Amino acid sequence: MTRILKFKRSSLLIFLITSLFFFLIQCINNGADKKEALNNENDAFQQYAGSKACASCHKNIYDSFIKTNHFTTSQIADAENIKGSFEKGKNVFHYNPALFVSMQKTDSGFYEVENSHGSDTLSARTDIAIGSGTIGQTYLSWKGNNLFQLPISYLSSVHDWVNSPGYSDQTIFSRPINARCLECHTTYAKSIQSELSGQQEQFDKQKIIYGIGCERCHGPGAKHVEWQTGNPKETIPKYIVNPGKFSKKLSLDLCRLCHGGKMGNIKPAFTFTSGDKLQDYFIIDELAHTSNLDVHGNQFSLLANSKCFRTSKTMTCVTCHNAHDNERGDVALFSQRCMACHNKEHGTFCTTVATTMSSISANCIDCHMPQMASKKIVSQLSDGRGFTAELLRTHLIAVYPEATKNFLLKNKNK
């Protein structure tokens, strides 16, 4: 009996020692992982070369890409980049007779200045322009290391200053900008105080790469540039990502990062890089119904509900979009890509073409991806002139009878 008790005690002791050993190993590994993650985060900015570094080997692509809306979706605010007018008579937004904001140019920069009951009461410098200007722009201001959205934006469709979307009929200079906002308008922004701290996120002003550059799709390129510069005769690239070789899912995940609607972070912004699985970084709503999806920012979810997409094994965003070129508004070009699948050989050619006009074959888009009013980009006009919603093309490819009817009426003699 004594031997049995001693054996049990020895077994228990061995078990406890073994468990403690594995626990300590796990703690050490976790500590190493956390330290490695911290080091990677601290070194992240150094891993980027900037898009200009790509030009020496890829000049034609670079020269084309810098004209795209992606590349110009954020810029340091200056006279060239701010789309709105600072001319007297064109630089004021009136909320009501007693309250307005004027856009002012001074020797120290550009400012939005609140005037209440005849006195300037608040001002903030315009530091960053968000948006290429094709649809419009909104503006950010630094306050220390914090970023805030300014109350007045610019809307290209009305060629005028407007109240920033979602703002009330009063001036607001205190809407904070977090890293997730910047993740879809910059290539990289270094966070120096995370939202996880319970305080507003802060950023390093000197470690922001403006615009969606080459490295958003091809991954951080500093190591690639260093290697290629030292090995100029090598034709097989190293240390760079080629999205053209991605699986369908990885290709879609890359675009979905910013065109996939609202997602919840489970890892810090900017840790997702090209080639990663989106589900490892975000909580994704896979059940969103198309009736609830806005045309702005939900391109993936709308496309995913389209018959074209659901019946294709290969269709991705790049089936229709060439990210290197500024193709926006080129209806004929996009229609040609539609007809790569929808043609007489496949028996899927548009029946309207055969019965009406030949010119419709150059425009599939207006009937099957019509412009619709955004519920998110709704802006208040100055002087109480009401509100305007921006028109954007839906990515839910379908048959829209009303849009088709309007198109046929408009083009009946063509």
Regions of interest found by a model, annotated:
Residues 1-39:
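Bacterial Sec-dependent N-terminal signal peptides
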Residues 5, 13, 19-21, 63, ...:
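Short non-domain terminal segments
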Residues 18-24, 45-46, 173, 206, ...:
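Secretory-pathway extracellular proteins and peptide precursors enriched for disulfide-bonded cysteines
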Residues 33-36, 45, 52, 60-129, ...:
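Primarily the internal scaffold of c-type cytochrome electron-transfer domains
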Residues 138, 144-146, 150-177, 183, ...:
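Propeptide (latency) domains of metzincin metalloproteases
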